Every structure is written in C-alpha cells, then in structure tokens.
From Swiss-Prot:
Protein name (Swiss-Prot/TrEMBL): Rho GTPase-activating protein 10
Lineage: Eukaryota, Metazoa, Chordata, Craniata, Vertebrata
Pfam families: BAR_3, PH, RhoGAP, SH3_9
Function comment: GTPase-activating protein that catalyzes the conversion of active GTP-bound Rho GTPases to their inactive GDP-bound form, thus suppressing various Rho GTPase-mediated cellular processes. Also converts Cdc42 to an inactive GDP-bound state. Essential for PTKB2 regulation of cytoskeletal organization via Rho family GTPases. Inhibits PAK2 proteolytic fragment PAK-2p34 kinase activity and changes its localization from the nucleus to the perinuclear region. Stabilizes PAK-2p34 thereby increasing stimulation of cell death.
A cellular component annotation (GO) from this entry: perinuclear region of cytoplasm
Subunit structure, interactors included: Interacts with PKN3. Interacts with caspase-activated PAK2 proteolytic fragment PAK-2p34; the interaction does not affect GRAF2/ARHGAP10 GTPase activation activity towards RHOA and CDC42. Interacts via its SH3 domain with PTK2/FAK1. Interacts with PTK2B/PYK2; the interaction negatively regulates GRAF2/ARHGAP10 GTPase-activating activity. Interacts with MICAL1 and WDR44; complex formation might transit from GRAF2/ARHGAP10-MICAL1 to GRAF2/ARHGAP10-WDR44 complexes.
Source species of the chain: Homo sapiens
Amino acid sequence: MGLQPLEFSDCYLDSPWFRERIRAHEAELERTNKFIKELIKDGKNLIAATKSLSVAQRKFAHSLRDFKFEFIGDAVTDDERCIDASLREFSNFLKNLEEQREIMALSVTETLIKPLEKFRKEQLGAVKEEKKKFDKETEKNYSLIDKHLNLSAKKKDSHLQEADIQVEQNRQHFYELSLEYVCKLQEIQERKKFEFVEPMLSFFQGMFTFYHQGHELAKDFNHYKMELQINIQNTRNRFEGTRSEVEELMNKIRQNPKDHKRASQFTAEGYLYVQEKRPAPFGSSWVKHYCMYRKAAKKFNMIPFEHRSGGKLGDGEVFFLKECTKRHTDSIDRRFCFDIEAADRPGVSLTMQAFSEEERKQWLEALGGKEALSHSFNTAIIPRPEGNAQLDKMGFTIIRKCISAVETRGINDQGLYRVVGVSSKVQRLLSMLMDVKTCNEVDLENSADWEVKTITSALKQYLRSLPEPLMTYELHGDFIVPAKSGSPESRVNAIHFLVHKLPEKNKEMLDILVKHLTNVSNHSKQNLMTVANLGVVFGPTLMRPQEETVAALMDLKFQNIVVEILIENHEKIFRTPPDTTFPEPTCLSASPPNAPPRQSKRQGQRTKRPVAVYNLCLELEDGDNPYPSKEDTPTSSLDSLSSPSPVTTAVPGPPGPDKNHLLADGGSFGDWASTIPGQTRSSMVQWLNPQSPTTTSSNSAVTPLSPGSSPFPFSPPATVADKPPESIRSRKARAVYPCEAEHSSELSFEIGAIFEDVQTSREPGWLEGTLNGKRGLIPQNYVKLL
C-alpha cells in the first residue's frame, strides 16, 4: 500500500490519522531530498575525478537500484510502473559500462546537476518552507484556542465577542494554510515522477556519445527508449489534467467546506476538551480528545491527542451513551460545555467543551440533546447539478451531428478536442442544438459560424451534462479494477464484458463516440491526438466519479487507461459478444503460488547491453503552446518527439544466432510496434522516426496482424540451417499455469489457454506459439502439449 491521499476536507477535522498521513508524506519527501542530494554529489564526483570513475559509477548505480517511487492510492499505471522500473534499468546499464572500463569524459552539469538542484531547491525547498509555516500556525492556532477556552464566562460580552472573532479569524487562516500545504505535498509527490527521471535520461544519452559501441547498444534498446519517453509524457499529461481538477476541488471546499464533508460511519466526530477531575486539592484539568459517535449504536469513542507533543495517539476510551445535557455558564466557569452520562458507567458523568457554540449545538443534536440544528455533522454529499441533456432521440441526433461535422471539417486539426472553444459560443450552440425548434436549422458541416473547437467543446459539454456519465456510476468501480491490475489481455476481456452490461442506450452512444475517437486517433499524425491524449481528454467525461474527493481524482489516470482500451479495441468490444467466462483480472504483482520457475530468455543478455535513452529537453512553455486552456492537456508525446532522433532503429540483417536472438528479444522496433494493439501506435511510432531506415520496410507492422500473418515483420527469412532440429509442426498446447509477459515478444495467458502452431524456439526453455491471432514466446514448463 502506497501513501494515502490527503483529503482537503480532513484539513477542517485535523484528525490524528490525518496528521499521520501528513507525516508519511513528509517522510517520503525527506527521503527523496536526501537521495537527490546524494545523487548530485555522486554526479559531481564523476566530473571531478576520472581516476575514481569506477567507484563513482558503482555508487551511482547502487543509489538508483535502491530507490523506489512511492505512489498515492492503491495501484499504479503501466506508465508509472515503467518509470519506476527505469531506475533499475539504468543501474544495470551502469554496471555494464563499468565492466568495459571505458574512459568517460562527460560534463553532466547542464544535463543532470542543474535540473536536480533546481528541482530540489525550488520544489522540495518550497515544501520545507510550507512545513515550517504549517507547524508554526498549528502551534499558534491551538495555543490560542487553549487560551480562548480558558476565558471566564463572567467577562463582558463585548470582550468575549472580540475574542471569539479573533479565534475564528485565526482558525480560518489555519485552514487556508493547511489546504495549501496539503495541496503542495500531493503535487510534489506526483511531480517528482517525471521531473526527476528526465534529467537522468539526458545524462545517459550523453554517455552514449562517448562509447564506441554506444550506437549499436542504443539500437538494441531502442524500443525501451521510445516506450519510456511515451510513459513519461503520458504521466506528465495525466498530472497536468489531474492538477487542475485537484485545484478546482480545493477551491470548492475552501468556499464551502461544510457542503463537501466526506461520508462517514460516524454521526459526529471532532475535537472536544474533556474535564479530568483530580483528588482535592488538585482541582481538574482539561485534556483535548478526538471524539467519534455512532448514533445507531449509541457508541462513543474518544482518543486523547495533542498536536504539540509529537502527535502520538493515546489510549482510547469507549462507552455507550445514556444521555446528554447542556451546561449553562451559571454552573461552570467555561463556555460551550455539556455533560455526557454513560450507560455502562452508572453514576459517572463527563463534562466536555466544544470549540464554539455552533459546534456544541451540532454535538447536542447528534447526541440527542435538547438543542438541535437543522443539519448534522456528516451531511450527505450535495449531488452534482444535472443538466437537461438526456440519452434520448434528441441526444443521439446532437452527438451524431457534432461527430459528422468534426469528421467532415476538422479531423486533421491539431489539438482536436484538446483545444477548447469560447465558452459563450459553446453555450449558445448547445442551447440551439437542444431546442427542438432550432436543432434542425443548425448547419455544422457547412456553416463558418461555428468553429471546430466550438463543436468539439459542445460535444464534450453535452456528455458532461448528462444526469449520469455514459459508463454509469454503478459500473464506475468495476471499470477501474481491470485498469489497475491484470494482463493486457485480461483487461480488454474484463472491459469488453463490462461494456455489454451497460444500459442499451449508454452502450449505443458509447459505441458511436468510441468509433469516432478511433477515427480521430487514426489521424494522429496530423492532429497530434494519440490514443493516450484522447484518453486524458475523455476519461473524466465518460467516467466522472459520483463523489468528488482527492482519492477519486487520483483514479483519473486509470479512467484514461479504460478509454484508451476502448479506442484501441473498438471492433472487438462493440462488434463481438463478450466471453462470459473470462477469468478474474490477476494483480500484476502477483505470481502463481505453485507455478514453476521461469527461465528468462534475457538471462545473461540484459547485463550485456545498456538501456537506450535519449537527450530529453522538454520545456513546455505557455508561449510555445498554441492551445492554452484549463481543459487542455499538455503538449502530446508526439509533439515532443517529432524532431528526428539521432538513434536509429534496428534494421534487418543477415540471419544468424545473434541477430535472431536480438529480434526475438524485442530489439527490433518493428516487433515492439507490432505488439501494440491497433494501427494507431504502430503508425505513430513510425512517424516519430521519419528518417529511420525501417520506415519503408515496416509496413507490415502498420496494419493489424491477421491470424495467418507473421508477428515478426523484421525477422529474416529462415533457412534450413536456421530451423531448430526438433521442430514441432502443427501442434497445440494448453496452459497449465497463468503467465504475465515480461517483454513485448512474450505472450500473457491464463490457465486453460489453447495455443496454435506451437514450435520449439531458439531460446532454450521457450516455445513459440499463437494465441488469439498473436504470436510470441511461451515458457516451455508452463504448457502441456496436446
């Protein structure tokens, strides 16, 4: 389990567990800060002492290998998993370079040291300053509350009112600072994933230029370089999209925190001061407790907690409520007090003090006191305002009309759906389209009055105005689950199954929309809207959560993955019936308990080749972006990759054991491209390297593979000498263990999967076979020949 999300609503409760979560985030940032300092120190050693290059590289590699990114939430995306694994790949590369004993003369000041120092000083340093302010304000706030609550009720009303106003102003200031600090903590946790890895990539690219064998090794790992670059760009895009949503949620809660309280199992909860009586002549003391009450069971929990003493939880008490009585100031020299009698403690009465008169009234209402408010502590979440958009005949007409206009007029427009239209024009167009009298009069395909960006914004706005998202609140969680776990095949199968559980109108509308988005992605070379970019734009629209929380916003990246799967597998999902017996998604980190050990075909090979990397200089300046808007995603991965890369892809060579091994291992760019579902990514990757010698020879990788076509378009034609001596012709095999692919040339499968055309592979311990039209490598001890 990674770091828990910090909810903005918890800033107003300031519970002990909220403080524990804050400390966990702070500890992680401190660990990151120390690691970056050590990394910078190691980088400077490389510059200062070439004679100690070997020692410095080993230390550097060790640091990279041991560091692991923490994440917010209960799962990570494939992009984040690849980014996390990239540090270990870089570590292996450094060890490989150390074996070669090459003399390296490289200045890493501009490519590594400065970006890391900038990140540490500007980002981590800013968090430290925020922490100091937060700690100082915490001390001030609770000290003032203590002092305020000790005021005698006999003082003049004007004096008491002035003190009340001062305390309330101080509390509001504390809440403001707490909100900003929580937002900053979560932002830096997400930001470091890409701002930290990018300088590393630049540093490694510089190293390649100083090694004679760097060019050949880079070709071997070209697929990894491209995939990691896309992973980083996707992560950046998702971060930018999520950040605006988080800031919007924070502003909503800041304006009206009471209306955004999270649903809780407790009727009331919060801090109360409890009077602890002592034997004479010591009097009594007031101790702050965090109290929780369940009205149904009349169960009252209270835990002593002091913010200023390190925030350690004390031993809690639990009792059952008998009755609650309001205390008047003529019977006690404190304000906001009430008494509680416990049913299981006869004769024992506890006197408690709330922070304010309003909070006392709320507690009295929850506890069954005489004075009650019209609202309780944990009010239900206010539902979203629903527009008059519906999935009726008019709704389908509007969507089809917008789609037809977009495909006719602007399918090649750069930033399609990413560039937003003028709000007033969008609202006017929607009003005309949703009016029965004017809908047929609106000509979107030929009229110059409506820009394409206005039409696309109107389409998205209409979908967001539906009473319920297209993929429904009921199935929202079910769609998220396969995006968080399982193999690529099992994800597609699970989402295929869930789509057919949607109401018929929802499924029909989703089919129309996804078919259109597939067409848009097929023109990504012109409009720059890849499948990933479309996922970022339409994820929140098609799968908005029912409750707005930080935890829900952290799942935006998984919503994007679901939309990507829908686009990449549109024909299968909407044109074929689902398999009602598909297996449950398997967690990516889980392995079968009794599966035999797998013999890695890269054993002994991976340590002999470095990670292919690139010189990354991604500066997304607002002035260079022609499409600035709140809803825009950042510059797409295609945009940042469109410049010709100095690293070329692997080209077909003469047959031989080494060459065949390289191709089977995924060194060929064509192999990697052919394993990506759909035509979009294959053509996209070819466009990224327009000067690559494989562009013209990789046409077979552009079109989706048919069951009879070869999945390895770059493999040289096999000769008699190349054929394995014990070839198995036209044999079938059944999987006896589930398997998760570790490489693009391998197959993922579940127990019971049937493989066609199984043959012995050149890789020891591996077979080649076809599953669902895709050919790849299979661990020999995971299957049984039929």
